[in-house]
Amino acid sequence: VIVKLAENYSHIISSANTFGKNLMPRIAAALDTSQISDIIKVIAPDTFLRPIYAGNAFATVKSKDAKKCVTIRPTSFDPCESSGGSAPIEKADPGEEFAKTKFIKREEVKSDRPELGTARVVVSGGRGMQSGDNFKLITSLADKLNAAIGASRAAVDAGYISNDHQVGQ
């Protein structure tokens, strides 16, 4: 659906969160264009700044592609001032070729904890926790520190904790 809608746009942009990092490479491949990941600054419509080497250096990336597929680091831009209005909402018709799929629901995880991607403190566990019950130890520590809870991919894959807690790659 997004690839079809992208015909009318020069830039396809997503947050550099788990969803965006999963979706945008597929869109870029379908559009036969490069993806520019994790930008922190827009220099020009075709030029972007992004961190490299774990944030120890920066690369200026210039794209010659007609379509730009870009993910933006969520905390890299200051919030803009609200002008009191809102953008119009346009309904997108995916067309008959997508009629075989049906959106059922989206489940959002509600938590009183800080969001994992922006938390100041994260308490994390891995496969060494050996079970989901042992993650309660991390939960009590995170409560005292007002921290987010993280988990390694191995712990998530083992079913010790849900995948919305996964940190790293």
Spans of features found by a protein language model:
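N-terminal glycine-rich FAD/FM-binding segment characteristic of electron-transfer flavoproteins
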Residues: 1-169
